[in-house]
Amino acid sequence: MAKESTGFKPGSAKKGATLFKTRCQQCHTIEEGGPNKVGPNLHGIFGRHSGQVKGYSYTDANINKNVKWDEDSMSEYLTNPKKYIPGTKMAFAGLKKEKDRNDLITYMTKAAK
C-alpha cells in the first residue's frame, strides 16, 4: 500500500515545466503580467490567499476557503482540487502521483516569482 503523502519535497523543475505545459497552461498563465484565462494567472501565488487575483471571477468556495498557498497546501490541492475546495470551478482532476506534484510545484515556485 502506498504511503500517505508527507507534504512537498523538491523535485525536478524541468519535468515540472513540461507538466505545466501539458496539464496547466491551457487554462493558466504563470508569468508576471500574464492574462487570466479560463483559470487565473498564477504569478505570485505562493504566499497569497485563494481567490485573490484581480480581474478573475472566483467561486465563493475559492474565496471562502481562504487558504494561504504554500508548497504543502498546493500539493494537497493538486491531489484532488474538487475535494480540497468543494465548489471550485477548476475542472482539472488532479495529479495523483506525488512525484508529479513535487516536480510541478518545484517549477511553479521558480516561475511564479
UniProtKB/Swiss-Prot annotation:
Coiled-coil features, chain-numbered ranges: none
Co-factor binding comment: Binds 1 heme c group covalently per subunit.
Pfam families assigned to the protein according to its UniProt record, in alphabetical order: Cytochrom_C (PF00034)
The keyword Signal appears for this protein: no
GO terms of molecular function: electron transfer activity; heme binding; metal ion binding
Gene Ontology process terms (BP): mitochondrial electron transport, cytochrome c to oxygen; mitochondrial electron transport, ubiquinol to cytochrome c
Binding site for heme c 1: C24, C27
Required cofactor names: heme c
Gene3D superfamilies referenced in this protein's UniProt entry, alphabetically: Cytochrome c-like domain
Domain of life: Eukaryota
Induction of expression: By low oxygen levels (hypoxia) at the level of transcription. Not expressed until the oxygen concentration is below 0.5 uM O(2).
Main localization, broad class: mitochondrion
One cellular component term from this protein's GO annotations in UniProt: mitochondrial intermembrane space
Ligand binding (heme c): H28, M90
Keywords, ordered alphabetically: Electron transport, Heme, Iron, Metal-binding, Mitochondrion, Respiratory chain, Transport
Subcellular location, record wording: Mitochondrion intermembrane space
Miscellaneous field: Present with 1310 molecules/cell in log phase SD medium.
Function summary: Electron carrier protein. The oxidized form of the cytochrome c heme group can accept an electron from the heme group of the cytochrome c1 subunit of ubiquinol-cytochrome c oxidoreductase. Cytochrome c then transfers this electron to the dinuclear copper A center (CU(A)) of the COX2 subunit of cytochrome oxidase, the final protein carrier in the mitochondrial electron-transport chain. Isoform 2 (CYC7) is the predominant cytochrome c under anaerobic/hypoxic conditions.
Family according to the record: Belongs to the cytochrome c family.
Protein known as: Cytochrome c isoform 2
Record organism: Saccharomyces cerevisiae (strain ATCC 204508 / S288c) (Baker's yeast)
Gene: CYC7
